[in-house]
Amino acid sequence: MIIIGFPGIGKSSVTRAYEGDTNTTGYIDLESSNFVKDGNWVKEYCGLAIDLDLQGYNVFVSSHKNVREYLAEKQDIFPDIVEVFPSKELCGMWLNRLESRYMKCKTDKNERAFNYMRNNFDTAVDEMEHDAIIHKVRITKENMNDLKKAMADYWDERRFE
């Protein structure tokens, strides 16, 4: 499964079975900031995500618009591409979460995520809500701290449709 993850959903947390261990959960957080942002990065980044998916991993990818657009075109071949993003009602809580993450770990990536969402939260949620990705998991107050359960609940509901 390829999981397009909104900043702060818990991608890194899910990939760690316990502190310091990132390789035993079946989940991989494919960090986009490790890729050189040249004209080919989206194809290379998404290609790696697809390759890892084919190997049986659940792969978290960034929610950049060009990543979502690229993966949307692959849904006929890879039907288990899913987006995970918060509901708009969580804006204040979400910004607190991102700020707290930045205060604990002052990386450029965390600072950029916090600053971008502080100014663009509603727009970012709207874009994901209305893009071409079919499967969408919405984070609510009830499932905000259990990403795996939110995704499992989504797929369980789809089985009965």
Role assignments for model-derived ranges:
Residues 104-161:
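Small-molecule kinase domains that catalyze NTP-dependent phosphoryl transfer to phosphate-bearing small molecules
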Residues 23-81:
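Conserved nucleotide-sensing/catalytic segment adjacent to the nucleotide-binding pocket
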Residues 1-20:
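Glycine-rich phosphate-binding P-loop
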Residues 37-39, 90-99, 147-148:
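Short, charged, surface-exposed secondary-structure boundary motifs
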